[in-house]
Curated annotation (Swiss-Prot):
GO terms for molecular function: FAD binding; metal ion binding; nitrate reductase (NADH) activity. Its cofactor is FAD; heme; Mo-molybdopterin. It comes from Lotus tetragonolobus (Winged pea). This is Nitrate reductase [NADH]. Nitrate reductase is a key enzyme involved in the first step of nitrate assimilation in plants, fungi and bacteria. FAD binds at residue 37. The keyword Oxidoreductase applies.
Length: 160
């Protein structure tokens, strides 16, 4: 099944997250594997509106290997074209010698370097349940200053 949780981007930094209005000038976006899908839709919505100046720091996109990265060409093209407000950082479990990004697991130090600080920011996360859990990304985001209410989560699930 696809992601659970209702998060709607209404434009120019405005969201409805689980029924509550939210606003952010900057977005910290985290995705694991196919969790890129709803995050990609938000990026696409922001970039198609020339008046939307929301900054997106899609700092962490985690996969097992480089070949598992979905939509990489599109993400890299957007990062190049919109370098003033869209950044992407990849993390893979295993990489070749020429890999220019991070290897291993997404952790607090990677988030501190590649995500915006929590002031005027909202973090969007989507990935398998273990990385969205209390043992995954949430504690690291809280440690760098994000409040739990500022981290709407699209929860990917494999349940039928």
């Amino acid at each position: 099944k696809g992601p659970l949780g209702h998060i709607e981007y209404t434009g120019k930094g405005n969201f409805i997250a689980h029924g509550e209005p939210k606003f952010a000038r900057r977005l910290a976006m985290l995705a694991g594997g196919t969790g890129i899908t709803p995050i990609y839709q938000v990026i696409q919505a922001v970039l198609k509106d020339p008046d939307d100046r929301t900054e997106m720091f899609f700092a962490v996109y985690s996969n097992k290997t480089e070949s598992d990265i979905l939509l990489r060409e599109e993400l890299d093209a957007w990062a190049k074209k919109h370098s003033d407000r869209f950044k992407v950082w990849y993390v893979v479990d295993k990489a070749g010698n020429d890999w220019a990004f991070s290897t291993g697991r997404v952790n607090e130090s990677i988030m501190r370097v590649h995500l915006p600080g929590p002031s005027d920011a909202l973090a969007l996360a989507c990935g398998p349940p273990p990385i969205n859990s209390a043992y995954g990304w949430q504690p690291s985001l809280e440690n760098i200053g994000y409040k739990k209410d500022d981290v709407p989560v699209f929860m990917a699930t494999t349940q039928s």
